[in-house]
Structure formats: structure tokens, C-alpha cells
């Protein structure tokens, strides 16, 4: 076959045993043979085996032939013709100079509208951007890599670099400098203009294009200097750092005298003395078993004395109630009248048949609120279990709730609780007659709401 007689040394054998050359297209004769076999109805896989050409090469050649009708290599997928012709580049430059903000796709549409290019020769958007970047804007950004341009200048002309031009001074700058500089804030006067700081660009300093600049560069080059501050300038700057932002137990030696005088010691002592004077000591004894402070409204006279009565049980009683003041079972509070003996002013005590009673007068501040002492932990108020409910409790359950010394198996029937009336529980009669609690007049019923009216329908 013709492709086997090709010069050896630059190719090899493919997977089918056919010879090929790297980087070279398939010979024209083989291409024509592939097309002829395809017209005869031979499948591409059979063509590949007969001609020993890879299946990909056969498919590519046949596909290109069906699309374009050509079997020549490089027609599809090859190098495109050059679209960046001098005429197109010149037009793109004209459009960009007329409208510098013109986009590449606008330039492409204008090239097609004016007939400069057709659909096959018009450059792409990326090509137009590359042309603008490399060929249109290049004359405006010529780098100054050499100083050859000085030879074309006449002796009377001087090319001054842009960095040598002094920028206009700010209207806020004065003899003290800019108001935003450190010297301007601190009020430090700057030296004369002959001693001002000069910053020269190292790249353009090597290319001095004038005789005056070359003569000035012969002198020693000035370096950047740092501003030095005196002691009178450093002290105001260090004051904010010496101030203590957090309270400390011990005074720091770095505090200034002005800061030490902010809170003098006599002022603190006088404040402590005033605070101590407002605290009044209380000698009121506290009752036992008062674990929590319970507060109720005041219903009694705040200055009426109270008596603590200890009752001695009868000898015939089967209860094992202790008869000491520390007992919490039979310790009661009774209001004692202001005149006469205590026994005559308390009628409920006459119902008792005890041999002796012990009374103690207490007029402390802790008993001012009357009902403040009444609570579940008040001595003299044991846990009361109603008679109707005693049947549902076992003896062991009741014994677990009440201490053995304060529990009796019999039904609890204490005479004072039966004889105490509502007048004792509410000494202030205004509470009983208050229309808030007991109103003799019938209150008008509220008008039925929408939901209630709907229920009655």
C-alpha cells in the first residue's frame, strides 16, 4: 500500500499493523479509498480493518466528507485565515479613539454593519480585545527603558519626568503643615521649604533627561528622616496610657498627682460613716423553724402587744405533748388588751381548765404585721389532718409526716380552734364589711359575649 512506502524513522505501526508518520496527514490516495469503500456500503469498522487505518481516523475523514464534501486535510479544525488585517486594525483603532468607552462586542457589530468584515472574516470579541490591548493602546503606553530619546531632542528642550512635578498644596496646609499630620495636630512648626523631605523614584532617577536634573543629582541624596519629639511632646502622649481604666485594690505608683486627687481618702471615709449611720441594729429574737420569710398584709394594730401562751395539757390526756416553751404543738399568739391583766382581756382563755398558763409579752418589730408569723412552720400550728381524711391515711404514713412527740392517734379536737371566731382572725372589721369580699348588693352581670350568645341560640 502507498502509505507503507513512506520514509521510515518518523512513524511506526498502529494497533492494526498499519504504518503512519507522526504529525503528517493521511495520504490523498488512502483518503479517496476510504470514501470509495463507504460509497460501496462498507461499514467504517470493516474499512478500518481492510486498510489498517484506525477507526477514529476513518470516522473523522468520513464525517468531514459528509459535511463539506472535501477530503483534503486541514479544511475543518485547521488554522483560520488571518482576520487581524491592517485595515481591520486601523478601523478598530479609529472606533476606539472616537469612543474610548466602546465595548469589543460593539466594535464587532459596527465592523459588520459598515461592511468592513463579513461573518467569516470578522474577528471575535477576544481578538478585538487583544488588538486593542496590543496594537491600539501601545503608542500611548510606551515604556521609558532607555534614554535614547534625548538624542532627538534639541538642546533647548528638556524632558521632565512626571514625578518631578510638585503637586498643588492643599488649602488646609499652612506654616504648621497639614491639619491631619502629626505636626499639625501637635502644633509643631515645620522647617522651611528648602529643608523639606524629597522622595525620588529610583527607576526614573537613573534616567535624568535634563542638564539641570543631572547637576542636582551630583549632590548627596537625602534620605528619609524621622520626626523627633521632645519631652514636652511625649508627656501628653503618654498620659492616656498611664490612666488606670480598671479599679485596683492598691494604688499604682505610676498615677499622677491629679489622678490621685480624684477620690481622696477622707471623702471615702465620710461616705462609709454615712452608710453605717443608716443601718439600725435589731435585737428582735427570731422564732424557731422560720426557714423562709413569709410576708402577708398587715391586719392588726402595729403597736398592740402580743402574748405567747403555753398550755399545760390535762393529766388525763393520752397525748405526749411536751410542756416546754420550745414545743411547736401548743404555742399560740393572742392579742392582749392595753389595759387590765392579760388573763382578763382574753376571753377564749377562760374555756381552758388548765392549772397554769405562762405568758410572755412581745412588742418587737418582727410581730408588727400580725399575719407575718402565720405559716406552715409557725410553732403552735401542727400539721392538721381533717377527721374525714384520717381514714385514708395509714398510721405509718401519718407517723412519717409528723414527729412522734407531736402525733396523737386520736382525732385532733383542740378547744381554742373551735372557740376562735372570725373576729379574732380579722381584727379589722373593715375587712369583713368591705364590699370587695362580702357585697350585699347584687353585681350586674356582664353582657354576654359573642361566644356566649352563640351558645344560647
UniProtKB/Swiss-Prot annotation:
Keywords: Developmental protein, Differentiation, DNA-binding, Nucleus, Paired box, Phosphoprotein, Transcription, Transcription regulation
Region (PAI subdomain): 12-68
Modified residues (Phosphoserine): 304
Presence of keyword Phosphoprotein: yes
DNA-binding region: 9-135
Record's GO cellular component terms: nucleoplasm; nucleus
Record GO biological process: branching involved in ureteric bud morphogenesis; cellular response to gonadotropin stimulus; central nervous system development; DNA-templated transcription; epithelial cell differentiation; inner ear morphogenesis; kidney development; kidney epithelium development
Transmembrane segments: none
Location of the protein in the cell: Nucleus
Major localization listed first in the record, in broad terms: nucleus
This protein's name: Paired box protein Pax-8
